[in-house]
């Protein structure tokens, strides 16, 4: 709705500027949201510099030339100093309510757009995911959901490291130590991986065995490849379980060994050589990217002729470039250098570069995490802790409900709290996940938003029981004139703007902020305006319809954030 409002404002402003005898590029209209209007333009500033005139006088001159078409979403245009302010019409409000009720879960969806291939998580299969990994998963999954709602055709991939040094250690460990298969498979892999690293630290001669395994895999030794595959499959199976609990699903798992077997790795190395930017450094083949601003060279082949993860990643990205219109990678801050080198190398051979979202790390109050040293709290343990704490709150708030209900709500609230608390922070900022704060119903996190949705459901259910509401009855949105009603309608109308902004800038936190603000607007409305208790029947019906609208947009917001929307809490 808001995007249509902006489109109409753009058309009105362009016509007025032309009628005022002025010219400006569309990109120089400079629209922004404002606390004084529904939309404001800074075009007068640009025109002032072009025509050497006072921006305030220009704004007044333009506004005097404004003509608003009948039925427009723009009700009034005014000048406030150099700013040109646009105010929504009553029609805009009424149409928003009608559109939400008509489109329901489709409200806020954009027109069909390009295909995007988005890669996220891609953690090494040497143990369970920890909280550091799941920030990648949550950012990636939320972005995929946002992009889909914006209209993009999104395929989500997990790039499986099934042949690097760490996997050689995992395979070696599985042969040397007994796996405890009574444990979750990825945890069993972590146990032997940690033992293996202790052995390797104590006995450096074992490193030669790891090197030999890597050479065998590179040479295509079937037995070694099979042992690698079995170890990786066990770890990935456990990782999938964890991701599913987090409400994260990948469309495809792509193994890096695929590109070695197909010859793609060899081909891309030869093409990079053909650019004339490779050289030998201590027997290894490196790429000089100094003209791209990188002082450090990129190693693409070891001195023994074997490829590196980076080399195989280059081949993977070349393959991805042929699968979609856009490629998006979600990487941690420790990949900032290598992702830049990867983009530069791809550019040097004429391959489409990925768009990269870099995120800083999330930690727990307990400190840092390392699978190799065995110093980590797994995502599974974190989920258990959070849902147990959520269960305590549910038992306190709803002691009369069944155990099954309490556990279901605790899982929805706990996992929702994890997802929201991590995604609400801009990716480029580091954060500490504090589960007590994340679960605080008064802190306006996921539980607060979920509770707002449940409250809307409860109001509608109560209205049905009291025969005060018929969802199919005709309503009159023009009766919704209270300030809190108008604020709520306008906040719902801006859902498509938020989706568009988050999709364009690849910043999922803006949707998290919006969802909280929407919950605020709904709760303010319910606090100050009687709904079921409204005396006028038509007003009551319209307010109940507004509650239903809020329920729909809250549910859409939560769904796009990958968070469950409970009907009762």
From Swiss-Prot:
Keyword Hydrolase on entry: no
Enzyme class, broadest EC rank: ligase
Motif 'HIGH' region per record, residues: 123-133
InterPro entries: aa-tRNA-synth_I_CS, Arg-tRNA-ligase, Arg-tRNA-synth_N, Arg-tRNA-synth_N_sf, ArgRS_core, DALR_anticod-bd, Rossmann-like_a/b/a_fold, tRNAsynth_Ia_anticodon-bd
PROSITE patterns found in the cross-reference section: AA_TRNA_LIGASE_I
Compartment(s) where it occurs, according to its Swiss-Prot or TrEMBL record: Cytoplasm
Main location class: cytoplasm
Domain of life (superkingdom): Archaea
Protein keywords: Aminoacyl-tRNA synthetase, ATP-binding, Cytoplasm, Ligase, Nucleotide-binding, Protein biosynthesis
Reactions that this protein is recorded to catalyse: tRNA(Arg) + L-arginine + ATP = L-arginyl-tRNA(Arg) + AMP + diphosphate
Pfam families, A to Z: Arg_tRNA_synt_N, DALR_1, tRNA-synt_1d
Disulfide links within the chain: none
EC number: 6.1.1.19
Annotated Gene Ontology cellular component terms: cytoplasm
GO biological process: arginyl-tRNA aminoacylation
A GO molecular-function descriptor: ATP binding
Protein family (similarity comment): Belongs to the class-I aminoacyl-tRNA synthetase family.
Full protein name: Arginine--tRNA ligase
Protein source organism: Methanosarcina barkeri (strain Fusaro / DSM 804)
């Amino acid at each position: 709705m808001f995007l249509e409002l902006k489109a109409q404002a753009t058309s009105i402003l362009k016509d007025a500027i032309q009628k005022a005898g002025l010219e400006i590029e569309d990109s120089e209209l400079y629209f922004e949201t404002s606390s004084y209007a529904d939309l404001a333009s800074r075009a007068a500033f640009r025109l002032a510099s072009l025509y050497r005139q006072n921006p305030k006088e220009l704004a007044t001159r333009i506004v005097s030339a404004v003509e608003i078409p009948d039925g427009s979403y723009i009700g009034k245009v005014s000048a406030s100093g150099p700013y040109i302010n646009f105010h929504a019409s009553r029609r805009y409000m009424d149409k928003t309510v009608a559109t939400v009720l008509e489109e329901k879960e489709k409200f806020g969806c954009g027109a069909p757009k390009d295909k995007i291939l988005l890669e996220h998580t891609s953690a090494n299969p040497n143990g369970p995911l920890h909280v550091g990994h799941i920030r990648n998963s949550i950012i990636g999954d939320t972005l995929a959901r946002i992009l889909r709602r914006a209209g993009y055709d999104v395929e989500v991939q997990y790039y499986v490291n099934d042949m690097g040094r760490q996997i050689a250690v995992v395979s070696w460990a599985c042969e040397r130590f007994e796996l405890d298969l009574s444990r979750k498979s990825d945890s069993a892999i972590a146990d032997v991986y940690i033992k293996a690293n202790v052995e390797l630290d104590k006995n450096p001669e074992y490193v030669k065995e790891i090197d030999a395994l890597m050479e065998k895999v590179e040479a295509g030794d079937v037995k070694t490849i099979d042992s690698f595959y079995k170890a990786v499959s066990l770890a990935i199976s456990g990782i999938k379980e964890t991701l599913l609990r987090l409400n994260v699903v990948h469309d495809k798992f792509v193994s890096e060994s695929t590109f070695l077997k197909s010859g793609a790795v060899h081909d891309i190395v030869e093409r990079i050589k053909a650019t004339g930017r490779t050289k030998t450094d201590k027997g290894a083949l490196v790429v000089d990217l100094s003209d791209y601003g990188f002082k450090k060279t990129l190693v693409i082949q070891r001195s023994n002729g074997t490829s590196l993860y980076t080399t195989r990643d280059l081949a993977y990205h070349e393959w991805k470039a042929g699968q979609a219109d856009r490629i998006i990678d979600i990487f941690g801050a420790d990949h900032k250098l290598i992702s830049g080198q990867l983009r530069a190398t791809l550019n040097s051979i004429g391959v489409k570069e990925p768009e990269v979202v870099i995120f800083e790390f999330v930690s727990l109050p307990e400190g840092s995490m390392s699978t190799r040293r065995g110093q980590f709290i797994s995502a599974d343990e974190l989920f258990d802790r959070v849902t147990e704490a959520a269960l305590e709150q549910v038992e306190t708030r709803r002691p009369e409900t069944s155990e099954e209900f309490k556990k279901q709500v605790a899982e929805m609230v706990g996992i929702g709290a994890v997802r929201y608390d991590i995604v609400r922070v801009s990716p480029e900022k580091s954060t500490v996940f504090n589960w007590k704060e994340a679960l605080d119903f008064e802190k306006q996190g996921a539980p607060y938003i979920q509770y707002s949705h449940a409250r809307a459901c409860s109001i509608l259910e109560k209205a049905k029981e009291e025969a005060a509401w018929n969802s199919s009855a005709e309503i009159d949105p023009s009766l919704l004139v209270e300030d809190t009603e108008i604020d709520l309608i306008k906040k719902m109308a801006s859902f498509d703007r938020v989706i568009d902004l988050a999709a364009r800038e690849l910043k999922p936190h803006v949707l998290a902020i919006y969802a909280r603000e929407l919950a605020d607007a709904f709760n303010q409305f319910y606090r100050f305006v009687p709904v079921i208790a409204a005396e006028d029947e038509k007003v009551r019906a319209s307010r109940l319809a507004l509650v239903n609208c809020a329920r729909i947009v809250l549910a859409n917001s939560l769904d796009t954030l990958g968070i469950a929307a409970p009907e009762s809490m």
